[in-house]
Amino acid sequence: MGLLQEKLAKYDLPQKFMAQGVYPYFREIEGKQGTEVEMGGHEVLMFGSNAYTGLTGDERVIEAGIKAMHKYGSGCAGSRFLNGTLDLHVQLEKELAAFVGKDEALCFSTGFTVNSGVIPALTDRNDYIICDDRDHASIVDGRRLSFSQQLKYKHNDMADLEKQLQKCNPDSVKLIIVDGVFSMEGDLANLPEIVRLKHKYNATIMVDEAHGLGVFGKQGRGVCDHFGLTHEVDLIMGTFSKSLASIGGFIAADSSIINWLRHNARTYIFSASNTPAATASALEALHIIQDEPERLEALWEATNYALKRFREAGFEIGATESPIIPLYVRDTEKTFMVTKLAFDEGVFINPVIPPACAPQDTLVRVALMATHTKDQIDRAVEKLVKAFKALDLL
């Protein structure tokens, strides 16, 4: 055994949870991701999906992908920089830019590669990156790849953000990067106050709208639109893997920023471009969420009903303001156990443990879709109450 194998062989935490029968990852789904999914030959209520608009199984989205494959083939065989740009990519970029209210947009192969490529491309050694300490892992990795000076502020603590800004050279670029909706806790960034501090300290703002697009704002344009601050946010990032029912991501900004990123963001230049099917499916989903406002209304009807039911049942759900509902457990082992008990009762939820949260903040994450019914929500709440009570958590 080599030194690397010796080092990595010591990592046996997954095996310990497997031995206890509570390992919760890589569970296999045997069909489309709707509100109910086929797993192990059984129907399971799906409350662990990020498909907020409920479009992943929509026949129009599927058919758009099929047609694109017939026209363009299964892949692009190159990066956008060289032979991998399709007219379909350009159309999607134009429509995304218009949708989020920016001059231009660039499409990347995944949402993760947007943040891991854009962030280091924007700053150098003389600049500063300032992040919320609960920003997504892709933002964390993006700032780690940057040569800039890096600062963090306590979650949604605007006084601490101001303290960090005061540490910066006033003549240097100061890039504040924040999740619009925090993916584990479901709360929103305090964007109005961040914008105020932007002007006070001559900073730049980048908002990750991964969990805001299709959920907040007019026609689902995101948290920036929800606050009426699109024009104050310099860069807007989004993904296709949630409300747009596909895979990929984008960054939108003014033309000068996009021109720079187009020629300097390494994950854009050196990654193969989005497949034709993924691009066409995202484009069709974008059309649907604009054409069907009732879908957004249904999402919020389901969300508000679920929030009411979980609160009435006595769950601790924190400060969530979104279809992401955290049910706090505050114990890693019990978080895995409650996930297993819920699954045994036919409810799929996601466990959240460090490093996705602080050790004292472990939780199970419930997520709503526009297509969830009140009956499905009621059944899920009933089963989760049973699971939590079995572990003396309620």
Swiss-Prot record:
* Matches recorded under CDD domains: KBL_like
> Which cofactors does this gene product need?
pyridoxal 5'-phosphate
Please state the Enzyme Commission number of this protein.
Answer: 2.3.1.50
> In the record, which positions carry N6-(pyridoxal phosphate)lysine?
K242
PROSITE patterns in alphabetical order: AA_TRANSFER_CLASS_2
Which UniProt keywords are listed? Answer: Acyltransferase, Lipid metabolism, Pyridoxal phosphate, Sphingolipid metabolism, Transferase
Q: Name one GO molecular function term.
A: pyridoxal phosphate binding
Q: In which pathway does it act?
A: Lipid metabolism; sphingolipid metabolism
* Keyword Protein transport part of the UniProt annotation: no
GO cellular component: a single term: membrane
Listed GO biological process terms: sphingolipid biosynthetic process
| InterPro entries registered for this protein in UniProt | Aminotrans_II_pyridoxalP_BS (IPR001917), Aminotransferase_I/II_large (IPR004839), AON_synthase_class-II (IPR050087), PyrdxlP-dep_Trfase (IPR015424), PyrdxlP-dep_Trfase_major (IPR015421), PyrdxlP-dep_Trfase_small (IPR015422)
**Per the similarity annotation, which family is this?**
Belongs to the class-II pyridoxal-phosphate-dependent aminotransferase family.
What this chain does, per the entry, is described as: Involved in de novo bacterial ceramide synthesis. Catalyzes the condensation of L-serine with palmitoyl-CoA (hexadecanoyl-CoA) to produce 3-oxosphinganine. Also capable of using alanine as substrate leading to the formation of 1-deoxysphinganine (1-deoxySa). Contributes to the levels of endogenous sphingolipids in its host.
Misc. comment: The bacterial ceramide synthesis pathway operates in a different order from that in eukaryotes. Furthermore, phylogenetic analyses support the hypothesis that the bacterial and eukaryotic ceramide pathways evolved independently.
**What name does this protein carry?**
Serine palmitoyltransferase
Species in which this protein is naturally found: Bacteroides ovatus (strain ATCC 8483 / DSM 1896 / JCM 5824 / BCRC 10623 / CCUG 4943 / NCTC 11153)
